Swiss-Prot record:
Primary localization: membrane
Keyword check for Cell membrane: yes
Any Gene Ontology biological process: response to host immune response
A GO CC term assigned to this protein in UniProt: plasma membrane
Subcellular location as annotated: Cell membrane
Residue intervals passing through the bilayer: 81-101, 106-126, 133-153
UniProt keyword list: Cell membrane, Membrane, Transmembrane, Transmembrane helix
InterPro entries attached to this UniProt entry: PPE-PPW_C, PPE_dom, PPE_sf
UniProt family annotation: Belongs to the mycobacterial PPE family.
UniProt name for this protein: Uncharacterized PPE family protein PPE66
Keyword Transmembrane helix: yes
Annotated membrane topology: Multi-pass membrane protein
Residue runs in coiled coils: none
Length: 315
């Protein structure tokens, strides 16, 4: 049994070989650009399968050897049942606890777990990097291939489609022209502008009519209301209450009123008068006394107004 166990342990693949195989597999997958590592990856997977087959064969041989050894061992009679087995159980507990809590086995288990976690994280990292590189390199090629395919399809099927769609395009154009004209006119002219133009025309006509009527006005006689004459007071003549005679008001004088042929003129401030000879301002404006070393008049007023009486040039 001991020899069979030692032989099986020596024939089994070691953890170092398994870790090296996993690392090589991750590196090959991460650098497999355009399938350049296809053959090395296949060899790596074949080596991994070989290790599995080797381990399975070794375990099968060891299982057969152990079964044969157990079958060839002499069968002993079972031990009698012990009613008071406290001493034996108590003596077996330290051995069981020592075998279970062996520091070497615990450290080995922890190391194996850490190695597996490292290998798994390394595979995930290499897979992410590999797929990212593959996407970055292949995506432009895929887009370029699609562009070429669509360009070829457009060259092949473009002219027949244009010939088929030309009647529909002409029909749409004929329908769209009057619609676009009506839409543009409705959006260009504001709502209610017709009423505004009609009111403006009627206002201009009324202004012209009033002007013509003003020009043809004839002198009009106006009879101003005369003030009632002063009569004697009732205190002087008490009988005025009984007999009262109403004297007719004297006839007033007629006055003629004509429309003026000039307006009120240019209005300004008090104490100033406008000059009709001064033209409308145009271009730059030059103040009086604007030569070098001069000073403005006090007070400074527009050039179209007379200066105030007594205002002189400032020295």
């Amino acid at each position: 049994m001991t020899t069979a166990y030692a032989s099986a342990l020596a024939a089994m693949p070691t953890l170092t070989e398994l870790a090296a195989n996993h690392t090589s597999h991750a590196v090959l997958l991460g650098t497999n650009f355009f399938g350049i590592n296809t053959i090395p990856i296949a060899l790596n997977e074949a080596d991994y399968a070989r290790m599995w087959i080797q381990a399975a064969t070794t375990m099968s041989i060891y299982e057969g050897t152990s079964d044969a050894a157990l079958a060839s061992a002499p069968q002993t009679t079972p031990a009698p049942v012990l009613f008071n087995g406290g001493a034996g159980v108590a003596s077996a507990l330290p051995a069981i606890s020592a075998a279970t809590l062996d520091p070497a086995s615990i450290i080995g288990i922890i190391i194996e777990i850490l190695i597996q976690l490292f290998l798994i994280s390394l595979e995930i990292l290499f897979a992410i990097v590999a797929y990212t590189i593959i996407i970055v390199l292949i995506l432009p090629l895929v887009i370029f291939a699609y562009a070429i395919v669509f360009a070829v399809l457009a060259i092949i099927f473009g002219p027949p489609l244009l010939v088929i769609a030309s009647p529909f395009v002409l029909t749409g154009s004929v329908i769209a022209v009057p619609t676009s004209l009506s839409t543009s006119l409705s959006t260009a002219v504001p709502i209610g502008v017709g009423q505004y133009l009609a009111d403006l025309a009627s206002a201009d006509a009324q202004a012209i009519e009033v002007g013509l009527k003003t020009a043809d006005v004839a002198p009009v006689a106006v009879r101003p209301a005369a003030a009632p004459p002063l009569r004697e007071s009732a205190a002087v003549r008490p009988e005025a209450r009984l007999v009262s005679a109403v004297a007719p008001a004297p006839a007033g004088t007629s006055a003629s009123v004509l429309a003026s042929d000039r307006g009120a003129g240019v209005l300004g401030f008090a104490g100033t008068a406008g000059k009709e000879s001064v033209g409308r301002p145009a271009g730059l404006t030059t103040l009086a006394g604007g030569e070098f070393g001069g000073s403005p008049s006090v007070p400074m007023v527009p050039a179209s107004w007379e200066q105030l009486v007594g205002a002189g040039e400032a020295g």
